[in-house]
């Protein structure tokens, strides 16, 4: 037994492996999983002249299945406030030396929006330009009824998991194929409906992005639960085997009747004792059992496969599924009112900026020829550069600090780290990780880590694949919104990879301020340049 990995565990602590869970460390570490034996466990009958196998368990394959499941525990949800909620907490804010700048910024935004609406009223006798007003409120009822229908259709993924849990179908055989075809149909339906209804750009972007969110939520839910359903089937088989092995331990007659072997691909098989077989089977069964529990350990599959759990997941501001999210104790009405008020105020500012800076720019180039557009493009870029970066910041705050925090408060979701301090970014890869945490976690789990574990890609290739998929989705949204297939945003996003390499050069290495200056130059010029490209060309 010198070449066989030693399983350092006694049988007694594993006697109740299905119910006993060590809460502080529910899921085994990668090092523990890698310590499992790379072989097959074979049970043979001593009296069989043909030396046929009674049962055979591919421990190596099951080990790889357990290791692949680590992808569903690559991000730990934990209670935390968003950055702006922390810095505006009364206890912190009153002591901050920068509180005056925070107040000044929002007063400046309020003064700006009042100025723009006042100018609109004096010059046009209306608070909002007629073309934009028509666009914003066009097909309003159709938009939200269509969105509600797409939400209802997403329950197909829940129904499929119910069928899998009831053993009507298996995820590995038919479930995966059905889910893939369904999500393809769901995406085609969303695109068809956008084009069929001819939604204006605002409605088109909202509907498309929300459908993309629903697709990602369904993908994460179905693949996570599908994986656990396969783990449950395998765990039940190991439970039966463990019962059989323990019967052999307790019965001299059975112990003398059966023999246990470990077979290896490149060396002779080795006979092991019944006690050693019990150790190996019990440990593997224990790890399989823990895969069916939530990260904290309080929820066990299939208890989470129910209607209300899925509804809760749709409302929770997370794109990846977890069997048990951290929660806050109380719902705060004053907090919800503040976020709702902030949302409407920021929407008013957004409409004013679009009305006075972006709509006139689009109108100015509408009837020009190509040469005329080239001549006016630099002037338009200069005009919208500052409004574009302000609009970018406002949209970031609106989505990630107001809307997501509002849904977090509704569901009492405690992990509100929806973004990091991306404004201090030194490299572009840091920006891609920090500015949109929900999407980053989804891509990290279901693209980056899954491509490494499932397709054996190198890390560099997995990074490229992740950036490519993200860029293609952004370009597809712009195609639907503008009707133009130009690959501008696709190119700019993929340029982040060589820009990261550029920032690793000596000129930027260990010069965080210089790197941050380089980042903000890109932020000032990038959004405005993209706007001009899509407006003019």
From Swiss-Prot:
Active site positions, chain numbering: 474
Annotated InterPro entries: MBOAT_fam, Oat_ACAT_DAG_ARE
Keywords: Acyltransferase, Endoplasmic reticulum, Glycoprotein, Membrane, Transferase, Transmembrane, Transmembrane helix
One GO location term (cellular component): endoplasmic reticulum membrane
Subcellular location: Endoplasmic reticulum membrane
Enzyme Commission code: 2.3.1.-
Motif mapping: FYXDWWN motif: 418-424
GO biological process: ergosterol metabolic process; lipid droplet formation
Pfam family, one: MBOAT
GO molecular function, one term: ergosterol O-acyltransferase activity
Enzyme kind, highest EC tier: transferase
Membrane-crossing segments per the record: 98-118, 140-160, 174-194, 199-219, 344-364, 384-404, 462-482, 517-537
Major place of residence: endoplasmic reticulum
Glycosylation sites per record: 250
Bilayer topology: Multi-pass membrane protein
Family: Belongs to the membrane-bound acyltransferase family. Sterol o-acyltransferase subfamily.
Function statement: Sterol O-acyltransferase that catalyzes the formation of stery esters.
Descriptive protein name: Probable sterol O-acyltransferase 1
Source organism (scientific name): Schizosaccharomyces pombe (strain 972 / ATCC 24843) (Fission yeast)
Lineage of the organism: Eukaryota, Fungi, Dikarya, Ascomycota, Taphrinomycotina
